[in-house]
C-alpha cells in the first residue's frame, strides 16, 4: 500500500513521542492506529498526545466486544448446497471465556497538524472493568464514556457523573455486549388500570432470524 509522505511523517513523529510506552502503531487504509499494551497507561498517553502533538479534539470514544469474534451462525461450505440454511433456529450461545474480551477505542483530531489518529487498548478481563476517564482532558469524553458504560458495562475511574445515558436508570444489563439477548430481559407497556408504564418479562423466544455468516 502506498502511504503519503505527510501521513508517514505524522506517524513517525507520534511514534517517537510514544517510544517510552511500548505502543505499537500502524498505517492501514490511509489511517493511523496506535495500540496501547497496558490500560493503566491510557490517560498518560492521551494526555501526552494532546500536549505534545496538539490533539485538542476527542471526536469519539467507543468499545468492541470480541466475545463471539470469528464465530459464524451458519457454516458456509459444500454442505449448504445439499441441505440449505436452517432459518429461525434457536440460538445456541456459548459464553466461553475470552482473553481481553473488550477493547476501548479513542478517535483523536489535531486541527493544528491536520491529522486524525485512532488509539485503542485491549482491556484485561475482570469482574469490574475499569479505565481512567479522560473527561478532564476533553469535556466531550463525558457523554461518550457514559455511553460506553451504558452499552458495554465498562467503568471509568474519576468520571464526574457516570450514569446511563441511552437506557433508563433501572435497565438491566448492557445491550452491546455479545451475551446480551437480542430480545432483552424485560418489555414495557402502558397499563391503563394502573395508569403507568409497567415492566414485564419478555415472552419472545431468542432466535437467530438473520444469522451472521463468515465467508472464507
Curated annotation (Swiss-Prot):
One of its GO terms (molecular function) is NADH dehydrogenase (ubiquinone) activity. InterPro entries: NADH_DH_suC, NADH_quin_OxRdtase_su_C/D-like, NADH_UbQ_OxRdtase_30kDa_su, NADH_UbQ_OxRdtase_CS. Its EC number is 7.1.1.-. It is found in: Cell inner membrane. Transmembrane segments: none annotated. It catalyses: a quinone + NADH + 5 H(+)(in) = a quinol + NAD(+) + 4 H(+)(out). It is a peripheral membrane protein. GO terms for cellular component: plasma membrane. Keywords: Cell inner membrane, Cell membrane, Membrane, NAD, Quinone, Translocase, Transport, Ubiquinone. Its main location: membrane. It comes from the Bacteria. NDH-1 shuttles electrons from NADH, via FMN and iron-sulfur (Fe-S) centers, to quinones in the respiratory chain. The immediate electron acceptor for the enzyme in this species is believed to be ubiquinone. Couples the redox reaction to proton translocation (for every two electrons transferred, four hydrogen ions are translocated across the cytoplasmic membrane), and thus conserves the redox energy in a proton gradient. Belongs to the complex I 30 kDa subunit family. This is NADH-quinone oxidoreductase subunit C. It comes from Francisella tularensis subsp. tularensis (strain SCHU S4 / Schu 4). The gene is nuoC.
Amino acid at each position: 500500500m502506498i502511504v503519503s509522505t505527510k501521513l508517514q511523517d505524522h506517524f513517525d513523529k507520534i511514534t517517537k513521542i510514544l517510544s517510552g510506552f511500548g505502543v505499537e502503531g500502524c498505517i492501514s487504509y490511509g489511517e493511523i492506529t496506535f495500540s496501547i499494551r497496558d490500560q493503566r497507561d491510557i490517560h498518560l498517553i492521551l494526555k501526552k498526545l494532546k500536549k505534545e502533538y496538539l490533539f485538542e479534539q476527542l471526536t469519539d470514544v467507543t468499545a468492541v466486544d470480541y466475545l463471539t469474534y470469528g464465530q459464524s451462525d451458519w457454516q458456509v461450505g459444500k454442505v449448504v448446497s445439499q441441505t440449505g440454511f436452517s432459518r429461525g433456529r434457536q440460538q445456541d450461545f456459548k459464553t466461553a471465556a475470552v482473553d481481553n474480551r473488550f477493547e476501548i477505542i479513542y478517535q483523536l483530531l489535531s486541527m493544528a497538524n491536520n491529522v486524525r489518529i485512532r488509539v485503542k487498548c485491549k482491556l484485561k478481563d475482570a469482574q469490574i472493568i475499569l479505565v481512567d476517564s479522560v473527561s478532564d482532558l476533553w469535556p466531550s469524553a463525558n457523554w461518550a464514556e457514559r455511553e460506553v458504560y451504558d452499552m458495554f458495562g465498562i467503568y471509568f475511574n474519576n468520571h464526574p457523573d457516570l450514569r446511563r445515558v441511552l437506557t433508563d436508570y433501572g435497565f438491566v444489563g448492557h445491550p452491546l455486549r455479545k451475551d446480551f439477548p437480542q430480545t432483552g430481559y424485560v418489555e414495557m407497556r402502558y397499563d391503563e388500570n394502573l395508569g403507568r408504564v409497567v415492566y414485564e418479562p419478555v415472552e419472545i423466544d431468542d432466535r437467530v432470524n438473520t444469522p451472521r455468516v463468515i465467508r472464507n
